[in-house]
């Protein structure tokens, strides 16, 4: 009997140690979507300097820190896979945050093949339920 109680207590402690619970994810309309307007998949970008134009439908844009229903802001994933969709999105060279509500951004990438993908998140940089992310595209910066 004591062992069962101890296991239950341990399970509760481990569960409450996670940063976000699924029930805490902000809802998003099922028909909402994010997409990359430009560049297009397979685009060749001479010089490596370009604007990324970000699209959103079925939801609204709000800066980080502003909690309004069905809103959030964009994050651009560069040369990386989607992070865990129930945690805060990292902020590093591969996870670019546009917390002011930007819908376009200037990038400069070195020569090579690069992937780009958008991930929409709430005021605390956590993806919604269901999560909104674009198709991953590949661009090429020639030498």
Please give the residue ranges for each predicted region.
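Short amphipathic, basic-aromatic surface patches that mediate peripheral association
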Residues: 55-66
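Bacterial N-terminal signal peptides
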Residues: 7-17
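Short beta-strand elements
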Residues: 130-143
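Short coil-to-beta strand junction motifs in C2/discoidin
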Residues: 66-74, 133
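A glycine-anchored, Pro-Gly-centered beta-turn/N-cap motif
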Residues: 48, 110-112
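Short acidic/polar inter-strand loop motif in beta-rich domains
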Residues: 83-85, 121-129
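Short, compositionally biased P/S/T/A/G/V-rich stretches that sit at domain boundaries
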Residues: 24-47
């Amino acid at each position: 009997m004591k062992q069962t109680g101890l296991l239950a207590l341990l399970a509760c402690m481990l569960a409450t140690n996670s940063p976000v619970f699924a029930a805490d994810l902000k809802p998003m309309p099922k028909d909402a979507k994010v997409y990359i307007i430009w560049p297009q998949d397979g685009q060749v970008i001479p010089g490596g300097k370009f604007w990324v134009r970000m699209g959103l439908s079925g939801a609204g844009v709000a800066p980080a820190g502003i909690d309004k229903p069905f809103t959030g802001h964009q994050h651009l994933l560069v040369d990386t896979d989607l992070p865990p969709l129930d945690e805060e999105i990292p902020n590093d060279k591969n996870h670019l945050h546009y917390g002011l509500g930007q819908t376009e951004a200037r990038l400069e990438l070195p020569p090579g093949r690069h992937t780009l993908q958008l991930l929409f998140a709430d005021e605390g940089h956590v993806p919604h339920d269901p999560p909104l992310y674009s198709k991953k595209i590949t661009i090429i910066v020639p030498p």
